[in-house]
Amino acid sequence: MTDICCLGHITRDKNTTHKQTVSMSGGTAYYVAYAFNHLPSKVSFQLVTKVGSEDIPVTQEMKEAGIDVKVYPSAHTVLFENIYGENQNTRSQRVLAKADPFTIEEMKPLTGKIYHIGSLLNDDFSPEVVKYLSTKGQISIDAQGYLREVRGQDVHPIDWKDKLEILACTDIIKVNEHEMEVITGLKDARQAAKQLHAWGVKEVIVTLGSEGSIIYANNRFYDIPAYAPREVVDATGCGDTYSAGFLYCRSQGIGFEEAGKFAAAMCTLKLEHSGPFDRSIEEVQRIIDKHEK
């Protein structure tokens, strides 16, 4: 049985910042997989993805890097265009191609303890697929994709129409401050976390950018600091890197505060370059230690 099974589309991304335009592979699945691959193999990991035939070489490269990848065919690979503001906290998006959604049939062979669902668009994972997976293991969700709908090529923010159905069988959720407000209607992070918990989620993570993050679990809040990077180069995949660090720690029975700090330190290192997390666990620990002196 695999400790963490991450499900999601690998994308082709065109990321534009005030400094540069970079074309690269991306998506929650991609960033989470590479983050796990740079951590000691105490936690077993499998990536389950769908790409168009033209992007099979990307998955082959991941396999050659040592990542366990299961690939299902899709008519197209998702193609995102991300344009970031100067502080990297704001982003506008377009989708130039969409991939096929995941099906229950594709989920049947999987044997994960935790299924991390990396939705990119609102129709990637139906409630039926999530409910089916919840009978096989714990459910961890990155909410971002459920709040995005494509009309033409433009990405429009939407409410999460099936949220109550899906949250009722969700163990862990990660949202940012914008997503929490859309989902709950609440502006206060602590109130929003409590509402998500009331809807059935056991562990709620709210990321607050440079203000850090909060974790709500077992009726208690944990305040997690943000560690300042040496420079901000590219925020793409930062939230996914946080999820990877958190799940890596929690799978080993590590406590919420320590897991949150580990995840935050991974984000700091990720911010300092384009592409997925590529540092060592020693560098992650060094950031935490430096700020706790």
Q: Model-found features: residue ranges?
A:
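Extreme N-terminal starter segment of soluble prokaryotic enzymes
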Residues: 1-5
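Histidine-anchored nucleotide/phosphate-binding helix
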Residues: 27-38
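Active-site metal-binding loops of divalent metal-dependent hydrolases
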Residues: 8-10, 28, 241
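Conserved beta-alpha-beta core of the PfkB/ribokinase-like small-molecule kinase fold
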Residues: 118-194
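Conserved phosphate-binding/catalytic region of the ribokinase-like
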Residues: 156-164, 190-293
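Short, conserved phosphate/pyrophosphate- and ester-handling motifs at nucleotide-, phospho-/glycolipid
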Residues: 36, 176, 239
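Conserved N-terminal subdomain of the carbohydrate kinase-like
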Residues: 12-23, 38-118, 123, 128-138, ...
